């Protein structure tokens, strides 16, 4: 059953079962959280990262896609680095591509979008930093093939 992920064990399970992550709202500016978190995840996580920003064609030496639908592989998790008013459209797109989960970054809360994602069968982590949680729970994360 889909839910808002809150406990450490749920977070570790979600991070373990996730392989492909789309970072929506990636910036090419090194001082932006989306860039720093993505650089850390590339070096320190088991994730395959895919980047979404219609204003960019490449970022961090990888292709950058205009939308989630443009990514040529199935995405497990959509990690959102956009302002709250943009979250509903990103959640709709995540549902449309069949993502398994949504990660709404630290400082961002959109209960209505979270409820819509859960109703569509997605797990939701909200108001959490994926880098911080991955680093904190690293000993409990067991990547699955």
Where are these regions (language model features)?
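Structural/interface elements that position substrates and couple domains in central-metabolism enzymes
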Residues: 2-75, 88-106, 110-145
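Glycine-rich, N-terminal phosphate-binding loop of Rossmann-like dinucleotide-binding domains
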Residues: 81-82, 106
């Amino acid at each position: 059953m889909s839910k808002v992920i809150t406990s450490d064990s749920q977070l570790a399970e979600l991070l373990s079962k996730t392989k492909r992550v789309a970072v929506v709202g990636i910036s090419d500016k090194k001082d932006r959280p989306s860039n720093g978190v993505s650089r850390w995840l590339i070096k320190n996580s088991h994730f395959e990262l895919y980047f979404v920003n219609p204003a960019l064609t490449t970022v961090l030496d990888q292709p950058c896609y205009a939308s989630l639908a443009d990514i040529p592989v199935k995405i497990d998790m959509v990690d959102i680095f956009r302002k709250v008013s943009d979250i509903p459209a990103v959640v709709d797109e995540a549902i449309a591509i069949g993502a398994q989960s949504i990660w709404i970054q630290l400082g961002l809360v959109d209960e209505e979008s979270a409820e819509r994602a859960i109703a569509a069968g997605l797990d939701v982590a909200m108001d959490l930093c994926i880098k911080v949680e991955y680093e904190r729970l690293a000993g409990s994360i067991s990547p699955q093939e």
